[in-house]
Amino acid sequence: MGLIDQNQPTIDDYDRSELEPEVDVEQVVLEPEPEPEVAPPPRWWGDFPLEEYQVGRWQVGSMTLSIYRLPREWRIIYSQGNDPLDPTLDIDVPAEVEAIGIDDNVRRYMFSQTQSPVTLTPVLADRPLVVRPAIPFAIETREEITLYVSLPMWLRISVAGVQQPLYEVPSFRPSDTWFGDSTLQGELCYAARAPAQLNISELPKRPYRAIAPILIRNRDEGSLVLDRIKIPVEYLALYNSKETNQFWTQKIILEQNNGRTKLRLGWGSPQEADKTERVSAPRERARRGLDIGAFGGIFRNTRGLD
């Protein structure tokens, strides 16, 4: 018996109109599947109503914050973690009273009568932040770069009926450092474990950290070697993107010329940001064309490029 049964019908025995039409493979275009929409992180700041004997609980990165309202007292309970880029973001308002940590830091504020709501306002640090690149880099004369830096934020806690904020808690508490040529010339700063990238897409995004674009211009005759950069965050406002909940500062422009550094700030949120709203004002107002060469400088080079 042969491999082909002579009694089996062949393709010629069918009505060709009943057959599937031939398809030119080269003409088939597969539409790409749409990427799933990624919802922005929940809004962890703003006004939160709390009734008497209710607790609000926020876990923002590695920091946990609880706010407890009593008839004549507000309690702020918080603890700090060690991971500056912890992705955790969880809001529970109202939460169970049992969620309050017994070993955490506690601050108590007494009033004749407490009022709702409680307000969390993101702000930047109360001191300059010193960023140390993993590897020092040089900017050649007459060149400029834009560096994107991720900055930690503080939570300013306010309550209804009280003019002044009760307290501020950092989402991550940086270590202290001294920035200056000597103990007599310089100032106390925070040592920011802050990611910094030339390409903004490579910068890790966190809803509790702000992105600061820093334009650095070298107008000196020689190379500008950067080992540490002091970011004067006290002059910066905070902006929030309505679409992504990402925080931004205005652009920082640092120009090095004849051994001195001039600071200028952009107006409003930077070009890289989406539609934004201003969330908090600067702690201090910068003078136009502020010369900060007399304030311990901005750039430091202690290791060189070797």
Predicted regions and their residues:
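Interface-prone segments of viral and bacterial extracellular assemblies
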Residues: 2-306
